[in-house]
């Protein structure tokens, strides 16, 4: 699974078979022994509590400790999306009107692309494109797009794909949670050196 680029949690459903196999000997071990049953119940209670805190969004975002995001990065990665979209929107809205008319958004991953699509209403953002995983197959921006607001592509400024790129901001979730997007650049890139349909294969990446 990992060799093909899958996430490490994809095969976790197989753990159910191990739990099922373990239930019989545990039940035999605890049967008729009040102290063993008490130990088992206490262990289960601790396991459930830790699992809830590590897996579900139960804590206020400002209280999420680094230990939890280290165990389950998904917790940290679920924080800050509305703020990130607002910051990208400000970068787009700061463009001159002529640039906004020929602008697109390009993101480094599907999470950013999804957030921009989800929270776009009210901002009037242009179309979103990404070369990440299967989003690449939706195709490139039109060749008429001369300006790109590029999110979370750290090497875009040195790629040579555009005549100019400038970092105009950095993503900040506002609560100090160090997740995958925190601190990533928001860049404005102008004048692609080649048509988008020729550049697009360079944007493709799987992870």
Kindly give the residue locations of the regions a language model identified.
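Membrane interfacial helix motifs at helix-loop boundaries and amphipathic/re-entrant anchors
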Residues: 2-14, 56-76
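Hydrophobic/aromatic-rich transmembrane helices and adjacent perimembrane loops
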Residues: 4-35, 39-40
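Short phosphate-engaging motifs
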Residues: 9, 112, 157
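Signature aromatic-anchored transmembrane alpha helix within multi-pass, membrane-resident enzymes
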Residues: 27-64
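Short, glycine/serine-rich, charged loops/turns that create anion-binding
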Residues: 46-49, 110, 155
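Aromatic/acidic, Gly/Pro-rich catalytic loop(s) in extracytoplasmic/lumenal soluble domains
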Residues: 87-89, 96, 128-207
């Amino acid at each position: 699974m990992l060799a093909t680029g899958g996430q490490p949690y994809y095969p976790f459903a197989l753990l159910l078979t191990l739990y099922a196999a373990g239930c019989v000997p545990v039940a035999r071990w605890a049967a008729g022994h009040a102290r063993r049953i008490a130990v088992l119940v206490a262990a289960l209670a601790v396991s459930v509590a830790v699992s809830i805190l590590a897996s579900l969004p139960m804590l206020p975002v400002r209280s999420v400790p680094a230990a939890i995001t280290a165990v389950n990065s998904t917790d940290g990665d679920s924080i800050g999306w509305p703020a990130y979209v607002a910051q990208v929107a400000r970068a787009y809205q700061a463009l001159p009107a002529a640039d906004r008319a020929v602008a697109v958004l390009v993101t480094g991953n599907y999470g950013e692309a999804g957030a921009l699509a989800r929270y776009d209403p009210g901002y009037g953002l242009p179309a979103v494109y990404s070369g990440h995983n299967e989003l690449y197959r939706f195709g490139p921006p039109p060749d008429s797009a001369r300006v790109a607001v590029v999110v979370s592509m750290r090497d875009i400024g040195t790629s040579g794909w555009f005549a100019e790129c400038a970092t105009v901001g950095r993503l900040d979730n506002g609560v100090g949670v160090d997740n995958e997007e925190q601190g990533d650049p928001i860049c404005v890139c102008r004048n692609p050196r080649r048509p988008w349909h020729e550049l697009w294969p360079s944007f493709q990446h799987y992870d």
